[in-house]
């Protein structure tokens, strides 16, 4: 048997492959200028602690990505066009949503009065078919005057294997957003949690009560203006046994 590598003949040439996959992640849409909504000073909200690590002197702008420009790339344009066509065919007077594409993910920013009909269209229209809502997340931007509270909905199309987000912003003085439980019943407890933690009131929810904190708990613990130290609670009736009666762990 010869060890001469010249005896090895190359196989047939395969089909040409594109240099880069043409997906939304690899072909990002051009975006506008970022939008600053606040500034962060130091770490974790702690003040006046005599910090010597240097982190207490950090100053960082809090910015949100700007609006995306057409073409968005990949299937993003198909979803945006399908949503516009479906709402128009349904006779809905829906304001054109702001579209933000960041880190390969698309978000539609809606007015609160448009949320429920848009959710209905996204679920039912055959071009869209976002059958599943994974929940709603709350975000608090205390320096974004008139838009302090944001509700972010995460939708999945199992038919088309696509994920999008819807986002609605409301003022702290009027924190009302329509509930989408009539469209996505599994959002029930998620809306209760967002109400409990952020104080967003979901109008039309079947039973909007606290879900983590006691019913009489003051405030909403995940807001930026909530005290870092929490609320002092006094426990009564506790006893500490003498050392010779304590449990041994040896």
From Swiss-Prot:
Membrane topology: Peripheral membrane protein
Enzyme Commission number(s) from the entry: 7.1.1.-
Highest taxon of the lineage: Bacteria
Region Disordered: start-end pairs: 1-33, 228-250
Subcellular location: Cell membrane
Keywords: Cell membrane, Membrane, NAD, Quinone, Translocase, Transport
InterPro entries: NADH_DH_suC, NADH_quin_OxRdtase_su_C/D-like, NADH_UbQ_OxRdtase_30kDa_su
Gene Ontology cellular-component annotations: plasma membrane
A GO MF label: NADH dehydrogenase (ubiquinone) activity
Keyword Transmembrane helix: no
Catalytic activity: a quinone + NADH + 5 H(+)(in) = a quinol + NAD(+) + 4 H(+)(out)
PANTHER family per record: NADH DEHYDROGENASE [UBIQUINONE] IRON-SULFUR PROTEIN 3, MITOCHONDRIAL (PTHR10884:SF14), NADH DEHYDROGENASE UBIQUINONE IRON-SULFUR PROTEIN 3 (PTHR10884)
Function field: NDH-1 shuttles electrons from NADH, via FMN and iron-sulfur (Fe-S) centers, to quinones in the respiratory chain. The immediate electron acceptor for the enzyme in this species is believed to be a menaquinone. Couples the redox reaction to proton translocation (for every two electrons transferred, four hydrogen ions are translocated across the cytoplasmic membrane), and thus conserves the redox energy in a proton gradient.
Assembly with partners or alone: NDH-1 is composed of 14 different subunits. Subunits NuoB, C, D, E, F, and G constitute the peripheral sector of the complex.
NCBIfam families: NuoC_fam, PRK07785.1
Homology family: Belongs to the complex I 30 kDa subunit family.
Name this polypeptide is given: NADH-quinone oxidoreductase subunit C
UniProt source species: Nocardioides sp. (strain ATCC BAA-499 / JS614)
